Curated annotation (Swiss-Prot):
CXXCXGXG motif repeats lie at residues 144-151, 161-168, 183-190, 197-204. Zn(2+) 1 binds at C144, C147, C197, C200. Participates actively in the response to hyperosmotic and heat shock by preventing the aggregation of stress-denatured proteins and by disaggregating proteins, also in an autonomous, DnaK-independent fashion. Unfolded proteins bind initially to DnaJ; upon interaction with the DnaJ-bound protein, DnaK hydrolyzes its bound ATP, resulting in the formation of a stable complex. GrpE releases ADP from DnaK; ATP binding to DnaK triggers the release of the substrate protein, thus completing the reaction cycle. This is Chaperone protein DnaJ. Residues 5-70 form the J domain. Binds 2 Zn(2+) ions per monomer. One of its GO terms (molecular function) is heat shock protein binding. Keywords: Chaperone, Cytoplasm, DNA replication, Metal-binding, Repeat, Stress response, Zinc, Zinc-finger. It comes from Marinomonas sp. (strain MWYL1). The gene is dnaJ. NCBIfam families: DnaJ_bact, PRK10767.1. Its main location: cytoplasm. Its cofactor is Zn(2+). Homodimer.
Length: 374
């Protein structure tokens, strides 16, 4: 009888990742588990098929061979139910279903790496652009100095677990299966502590606050992460420490907005400067510069100052500062100033020669109403 496609067996797409494959297998294998279907031989066959499919698709090498050559590429490599041996199906079953049946978990190592930590660091825009060094204080778990991380009272030592013989796991029979589970006595440590340390209560770790100096490279932006290896929580039973990930968050700036390597700002200019032109001071992150405003400048016009932006942290050219001019309408006018504006308005007449956008707008309105009348 020809075998079904392994992807169809698990009900996953051919580009499914390991997480989705494991999730699908776990759900279906739990459904067709022989212990739940003791009088259903079809369920047992289905369970065998699921186990075989998962063994192939959960292995990068076997999956690659299967994707290329189909079942011919993996013949003899799938152990299936009852054929995988000590390192085959029982390991798969323990990895996937350990928590359902009271423990499990593949791997024999008793050491455990410490957890990674994350710290969100708020920076001013200037700090992010130029780089800086910041001091942070984080809560973490460190090795207990009293017992040197052993968890045992000073002068005593942990003893080999009598239940698992130091392996950290025990083999349990459940129905048709012999599976490995985490030892219920030592919880996987392989050792038991009869006289625990008073400071860490046998855990081997205590909580402390740790102060670190973090060097922030120039050009970072919100969302960037800085990894500090070994600065996470201490491992257990001699395991390595985790890492600390510093997440950058740049605070809003009162003048500038950042988009990648470019900076943006609005620059207010007077009515007369917009009409006649002139030079104005524009702020940049490294000082003021003079910007020449052309005559008859309209509100919203953009001026680009080359290389006045940000040099990206991952390399590349320095960005630009893009200035958007905003023409301000004069306020708090004196009587004389109002007279002058009245004279100016009269000199311009009723036409729109001096207001090209206004003329374009009125032309558009006229076409709109002409179309309605048709």
């Amino acid at each position: 009888m020809s075998k079904r496609d392994y992807y169809d067996v698990l009900g996953v797409a051919k580009d499914a990742d390991k997480k989705d494959i494991k999730k699908a297998y776990r759900s279906l294998a739990n459904k067709y588990h022989p212990d739940k279907n003791p009088d259903n031989p079809e369920a047992l066959d289905k369970f065998k098929e699921l186990a075989e499919a998962y063994e192939i698709l959960s292995s990068d090498d076997k999956r690659a061979a299967y994707d290329r050559f189909g079942h011919d590429g993996v013949n003899g490599q799938a152990g299936g139910y009852g054929g995988a041996g000590a390192g085959g199906f029982s390991d798969i079953f323990g990895d996937v279903f350990g928590d359902i049946f009271g423990g499990g978990g593949g791997g024999q190592s008793r050491t455990r790496r410490g957890s990674d930590l994350r710290y969100t660091l708020e920076l001013d825009l200037e700090q992010a652009v130029w780089g800086c060094e910041e001091k942070i204080r984080i809560p973490t778990l460190v090795n207990c100095k009293t017992c040197d991380g052993s968890g045992a009272k000073k002068g005593s030592t942990p003893k080999t677990c009598g239940t698992c013989g130091g392996a950290g796991q025990v083999r349990m029979s459940q129905g048709f299966f012999s599976v490995q589970q985490t030892c219920p006595e030592c919880h996987g440590a392989g050792q038991v502590i009869s006289d625990p340390c008073r400071d860490c209560h046998g855990q081997g770790r205590v909580q402390e606050y740790k102060t670190l100096n973090v060097k922030i490279p120039a050009g970072v932006d919100t969302g960037d992460r800085i990894r500090l290896s070994g600065e996470g929580e201490a491992g257990t039973h001699g395991g390595p420490a985790g890492d600390l990930f510093v997440q950058v968050s740049v605070k809003p700036h009162s003048i500038f907005e950042r988009d990648g390597a470019n900076l943006y700002c609005e620059v207010p200019i007077s009515f007369t400067t917009a009409a006649l032109g002139g030079e104005i001071d524009v702020p940049t992150l490294d000082g003021r510069v003079r910007l020449k405003v052309t005559a008859e400048c309209q509100s919203g016009k953009l001026f680009r100052l080359r290389n006045k932006g940000v040099k990206p942290v991952r390399g590349g050219p320095v960005g630009d500062l893009i200035c958007k001019v905003v023409v301000e309408t004069p306020v708090n006018l004196t009587s004389r100033q109002k007279e002058l504006f009245t004279e100016l308005a009269e000199s311009m007449g009723e036409g729109t020669d001096h207001s090209p956008k206004q003329k374009s707008w009125f032309d558009g309105v006229k076409r709109f109403f002409d179309d309605i009348k048709k």
